[in-house]
Amino acid sequence: MIKLRLKRYGKKREVSYRIVAINSSSRRDGRPLEELGFYNPRTDETRLNVPGIVKRLKEGAQPTETVRSILQKAQVFEQVNA
């Protein structure tokens, strides 16, 4: 099963995340199938590859709760249902 989840990177206490499509049995920081965005919780900065995310969601990828809330803020699910 493919999941959309966060991949941690950055320095200690200055963490950032990449939103990735990855096999659900892979490690948190394992090799992703595709990088789909960026999220920095310190500045609340978010950059998303919306066409790539919509494609993965239509293929059946399941977002984690955190990624789901990020995508809802960006109103990505409206584009999936359209």
UniProtKB/Swiss-Prot annotation:
The keyword Ribosomal protein applies. Keywords: Ribonucleoprotein, Ribosomal protein. Signal peptide: none annotated. It comes from the Bacteria. Coiled coil: none annotated. The keyword Transit peptide does not apply. GO terms for biological process: translation. GO terms for molecular function: structural constituent of ribosome. One of its GO terms (cellular component) is small ribosomal subunit. HAMAP family: Ribosomal_bS16. PANTHER family: 30S RIBOSOMAL PROTEIN S16 (PTHR12919), SMALL RIBOSOMAL SUBUNIT PROTEIN BS16M (PTHR12919:SF20). Belongs to the bacterial ribosomal protein bS16 family. This is Small ribosomal subunit protein bS16. It comes from Rippkaea orientalis (strain PCC 8801 / RF-1) (Cyanothece sp. (strain PCC 8801)).
